[in-house]
Every structure is written in C-alpha cells, then in structure tokens.
C-alpha cells in the first residue's frame, strides 16, 4: 500500500474531500482550528450524555491487562476498554493516537489512569466511534489509544479535534496519530502483521503493532 499524504492546507475546518480515504495509511495533519474543535467537542459531549442515558457505553474487561508491543521496540499494557452499542461498521479503520504528558512521573501515571475515565465524553460521542483500548505509558512515557472507527475521515476529524485538548497537558511535539483504513481492531489484535506494509518506509512506526501477549 502507498502512503497517503495531504496538501498543505490551513487547519480551518473538518476534511471536505474523499481523496485521502483511499487504501493506505493516513498520516497526520495539523489540529483543527480552535472554534471548529470546540464545536466538535461540545457536540460529542452532548451525544455522550444521550448514550449514557441509553446505557449504550460499556467497559468490558476482556482485553484489560493485555500487553501490546510496537515496531519501535516499546510496549504498553491495556488498562481500560470502552465500547459503544451501535449498528454494523460499514467502513472500518484503526486509529492510533500517542502523546506524552508533561511533568507526570511515578505515581502520577497511576493517578492519570484513574482520572482518565472522566475524559470519556471527549471521544465516545464522536460520529463513527466503535471502540477504544486505553494503553498505559510505555518505556518512553508515551500513552497510546488504539481505536476502531467507522470511517477514516471521521477518525481523523476526531484526532484533529482531540489534539487541541491533549496539547493542554502534553509535551510539545509528542502528539501524533495514524489512521489505517480497511482494518478492524480485532483483526490487528489477532493478527498484528495485518498492519505491516501499510506505510511508506519514511513513516515512523510507533503505531505498528507487532505482538499481543
């Protein structure tokens, strides 16, 4: 597969083209403009409230404790899973997000893992959300989220909005995301090589899963 790149466009709004939804890795663009990101996050929070009332958000324990190893030599443990009841996923993709928190050391990581549940309204109500695996800090202090999304464009819209929130608490330059169209989360967990060969050689592979144990 070839790498999909985007033109140098200003971050003024949500994606308005289907050009970057073709087969291959969708690499990151700058975050959304603040007003656009805030509107998206507010809409997400409202949808999350409705999903909670309908009891459609769940925290299954099946993957908790699983260790995921990545192509950059790091690994991280799944400490939470979030899924939402929804219809069939028609255009699956995997989204991987990473960031490194500022000034968090030692017990601070445990505190973050506990309070991070309160961040659920920041993602579960976005259009196309299917599931999220929350990964603890790896050997380099980086956190990852491994998501399944319905629609690569929707996944990227979410990642670019989330960026604005993460930037408030993250080390500058540590926020990254990658979208992998055509893959399902359970597929890459069962067969990590499914992620291999999906990116050009010059794309850093912090996101590529190599082993699940």
List PLM regions with ranges.
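Short S/T/G/P-rich N-terminal loop/turn motif that feeds into the first structured element of a domain
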Residues: 2-126, 181-213
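Short, well-ordered beta-strand segments in beta-rich or mixed alpha/beta enzyme
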Residues: 94-99, 131-161
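Amphipathic alpha-helical interaction segments
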Residues: 123-126, 156, 169
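A general secondary-structure junction signal
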Residues: 136-138, 179-183
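Short, non-transmembrane amphipathic alpha-helical segments
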Residues: 162-166
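Conserved short beta-strand edge segments in small beta-sheet-based binding/regulatory domains
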Residues: 167-181
């Amino acid at each position: 597969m070839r790498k999909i790149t985007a033109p140098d466009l200003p971050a003024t709004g949500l994606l308005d083209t289907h050009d970057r939804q073709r087969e291959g890795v969708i690499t990151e663009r700058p975050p959304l403009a603040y007003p656009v990101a805030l509107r998206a996050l507010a809409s997400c929070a409202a949808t999350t409230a409705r999903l909670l009332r309908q009891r459609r958000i769940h925290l299954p324990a099946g993957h908790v404790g699983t260790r995921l190893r990545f192509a950059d030599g790091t690994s991280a443990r799944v400490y939470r899973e979030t899924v939402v009841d929804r219809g069939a996923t028609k255009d699956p993709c995997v989204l991987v997000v990473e960031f490194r928190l500022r000034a968090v050391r030692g017990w601070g990581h445990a505190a973050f893992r506990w309070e991070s549940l309160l961040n659920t309204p920041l993602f579960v109500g976005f259009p196309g959300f299917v599931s999220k695996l929350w990964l603890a800090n790896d050997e380099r202090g980086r956190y990852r989220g491994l998501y399944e999304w319905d629609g690569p464009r929707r996944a990227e819209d979410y990642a670019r909005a989330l960026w604005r929130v993460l930037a408030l608490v993250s080390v500058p330059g540590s926020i990254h995301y990658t979208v992998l169209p055509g893959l399902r989360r359970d597929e890459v967990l069962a067969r990590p090589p499914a992620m291999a060969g999906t990116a050009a050689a010059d794309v850093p592979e912090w996101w590529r899963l190599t082993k699940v144990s």
